Amino acid sequence: DDKARVKTLQCLNILDTQREERFDRIARLAAQLFQCEFASISFIDEKRQWFKSLVNLSLEQTTRETAFCAHTINHASTFIVPDTHQSETFKGNPFVINAPHIRFYAGTPIVVNGHRIGALCVFDPKPRTFSPQEEGQLNDLCRLVESELNREELTWLTAQLSQKQTALEENQKLTRVRSVILEKVVNCESLPSVLKHIVESI
């Protein structure tokens, strides 16, 4: 269900935010570990691929149609293209024909609440293989990305809970004041007495 997937992504409030070192660090590590020129952490919404982190390229986003990672989110595990020139799906891709001239790609889906919302990927202008051990390492790095996203979600939920709790406390306080006013009016107490009890109730 792509609508549920996109909704999960939107609820993270991560799209169109500033670059962050905690994500950049993971992307840099991926590029270094697998000796690839490029690496990225990207998210796929309805129409685009948006980059939270990108190593050695200056892009904010691409269309979903041209995004390698849009294919990655259709797979439960690491998606690998050893040589794009040998792939009917990718040999005509604009990022293969033109800069950065992608020949090799490997991406692992980023999963939040059961939905594959994006990918951590490495890619290079030279074709190459990708071993099962390397798949496992890329998967481990991707889990770090998910941990950061879950921490972000927890922070946001905590802030929302705090706001709701404050609103509830204010509402309860208002209810107490109303009860005091009603009680004093029913008992025909003087206005100064009513005001005094209101102040004490706040």
Stretch-by-stretch model annotation:
Residues 1-15, 29-33, 48-55:
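Domain-scale activation on soluble regions of proteins
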Residues 32-35, 74, 147:
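Solvent-exposed polar/charged
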Residues 103-111:
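A short, aliphatic-rich beta-strand micro-motif
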Residues 7-8, 38, 44, 48-54, ...:
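Regulatory sensory and allosteric helical modules in signal-transduction proteins
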Residues 69, 110-124:
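Sensory-domain boundary capping and coupling elements
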Residues 1-20, 156-187:
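Signal-transmission linkers at sensory-effector interfaces
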